[in-house]
A protein has these predicted regions:
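Acidic, metal-coordinating catalytic cores used for nucleic-acid/nucleotide bond scission
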Residues: 2-6, 26-29
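Basic, amphipathic alpha-helical segments enriched in Lys/Arg and hydrophobic/aromatic residues
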Residues: 140-169
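Short amphipathic alpha-helical "interface-anchor" segments enriched in bulky aromatics
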Residues: 114-149
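Short, conserved catalytic/metal-binding motifs centered on acidic residues
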Residues: 1-5, 20, 105, 130-135, ...
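Short Gly/Thr/Asp-enriched flexible loops that form oxyanion-binding sites at enzyme active sites
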Residues: 5-14
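Glycine-enriched alpha-helix->loop->beta-strand junction motifs that scaffold or abut catalytic
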Residues: 15-19
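An anionic, glycine-rich sequence signature occurring as long contiguous blocks
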Residues: 21-127
Length: 169
C-alpha cells in the first residue's frame, strides 16, 4: 500500500538508505505543496510534455522540482524532489468529455528530464497498476475478496494468502 507522506516515513527510508516515491496528496505537507507551486513557474526547463494512449489523445505534462528543504514535526531535515504529472485525455465514462487527473510524488531521487517518465511509470504509478490489475480482480473478478468469510484474524490471513496463490495460478 502507499506510504504516508510525512517526515517519519522519510526518516525511516533515509535511515536505511532506501529510495522512495511517496504519493503527495493535496493537504499532505502543505509546506512542500506551497514550495512546489511557487517554484514551477520559475523553472520552465523542468517540464516535459508527452502524448500517449490511443492515437496520442492523452496528454501528460510533467513538472519537477529538486532540492526542496523540509523540516518535519520531529525537527528532522529532509531534502526532497517533487514530481507531478497532469494527465488530460478522453473520459471513458463520459464520451466526448475530457478528464484531468493529477499525480504528485515526493521522492529522494534526483529528478532529471531523462528519467522523469521512467520514475513516474515504474515508481509512482506502479502501485496504481498493482491495485487495478491485482486487487480489483480479487474484489470483482470472482474471488469475492470483500466477503467476510470469518471474523477470526488468523483464518482471514490464511484465506487471503490462499486467495493470493489462487490468483497467481
Amino acid at each position: 500500500d502507499s506510504l504516508f507522506a510525512g517526515g517519519p516515513t522519510m526518516s525511516i527510508c533515509e535511515r536505511y538508505h532506501w529510495k522512495y516515491m511517496i504519493v503527495h496528496k493535496e493537504g499532505d505537507i502543505p509546506f512542500i505543496h506551497q514550495e512546489f507551486e511557487s517554484l514551477v513557474p520559475l523553472t520552465p526547463e523542468n517540464q516535459l510534455t508527452f502524448h500517449t494512449g490511443p492515437q496520442g489523445k492523452t496528454r501528460q505534462e510533467y513538472h519537477w522540482i529538486n532540492d526542496i528543504a523540509y523540516t518535519d514535526s520531529e525537527k528532522d531535515k529532509h531534502t526532497v524532489g517533487v514530481l507531478e504529472c497532469v494527465e488530460r485525455g478522453p473520459d471513458p465514462k463520459q464520451p466526448g468529455q475530457t478528464k484531468t487527473t493529477r499525480f504528485r510524488w515526493i521522492t529522494n531521487f534526483t529528478l532529471k528530464e531523462k528519467q522523469v517518465l521512467e520514475l513516474a511509470y515504474q515508481g509512482g504509478r506502479i502501485r496504481w497498476k498493482i491495485e487495478n490489475e491485482g486487487f480489483n480482480v480479487q474484489k470483482n473478478g470472482g474471488f469475492d475478496l470483500e466477503h467476510a468469510y470469518t471474523t477470526d484474524p488468523v483464518a482471514i490471513k490464511v484465506f487471503y494468502f490462499l486467495l493470493q496463490i489462487a490468483h497467481r495460478l
